[in-house]
Amino acid sequence: PAGDVLLLFVIAGLVLFFTRNWGDGAILAAAVVFLLQPVEWYHCIAGLLNPAHRLPDLGVGEMYARVAEYTKAGNFGDFILGNVTLGQKASLLWAVNAGRFVQTAGLFLLGFYIGRKQLFVATEKNLRFWVKTLIVSAIAFAPLYTLRELVMDNGAVVGQTAGTALDMWQKLAFTLVLVASFILLYQRRKFSAAVAGLRFYGRMSLTNYLSQSVIGAFVYFPFGLYLAPRCGYTASLLVGILVFLLQVRFCKWWLGRHKQGPLEYIWHKWTWIGTDK
């Protein structure tokens, strides 16, 4: 319940502003550097060379304990106030602690590079690229996952640093498997027709993300219906599917009457404030 990932995206997204005029090669190189998790490897090497080396204590555990207190209390006003103050701080510092901040910057740059190279355009060359990506990522996932499990058991500092880096890598490999698989399957008419509704959902991703958060908080938290203690995995999955289907219907209805989602429109206007766009 603490904070929101959008704060992380806003801060990490500044890397795109500073690299917007870089060449493709420089952007890809910067993405690789970030994705290698240099901060985690620094602490890992420092811990191996000096057993007394300790990771920075950002107090995330204590902050999340306080977040749990006001969330369980069920006071809506305290929840909102805590979430926009302490919750945001806890969420952001957790991301820094867990390697997510550097990872996010790297993923933004990787997405920037993919967009520049137009790799999502269904050309023969690009499809060959995604086939290779699928093969390499699928092969890399298993050893990365296994190595991550082994490293996690190898002492506190090594497990929390090298383990974090390897965890990010195996997740990146799995993500690329999913992305490449989707792109290749999308070339088949039946599959593309089956998932056609997702394009409406994607065009309103910000609106959907925030509305999901609001609905989820009302359904599960103490200030709302408080179904968390009574909903198991299956019930929660069904709730998620129901909310998703309702959102898809709403997106189709809204985009039939407007060019953008409501929050996407506000984001666009604020992004280009002072211009005619």
Predicted feature residues:
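Functional transmembrane helices that form membrane-embedded active or gating regions
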Residues: V131-L134, Y186-G216, K259-T271
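Specific transmembrane alpha-helix
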Residues: L6-T19, G99-A122, Q170-R189
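C-terminal "closing" transmembrane helix and its immediate cytosolic amphipathic cap
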Residues: C231-K277
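Internal alpha-helical transmembrane segments
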Residues: P1-H43, G216
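Alpha-helical transmembrane segments and terminal signal-anchor/GPI-anchor hydrophobic tails
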Residues: K132-Y186
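Long hydrophobic alpha-helical segments that form multi-pass transmembrane helix bundles
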Residues: V32-L110
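Solvent-exposed interhelical
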Residues: V15-A30, Y113-I135
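Kinked, hydrophobic transmembrane alpha-helices enriched for aromatic residues
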Residues: I139-R148, F200-L227
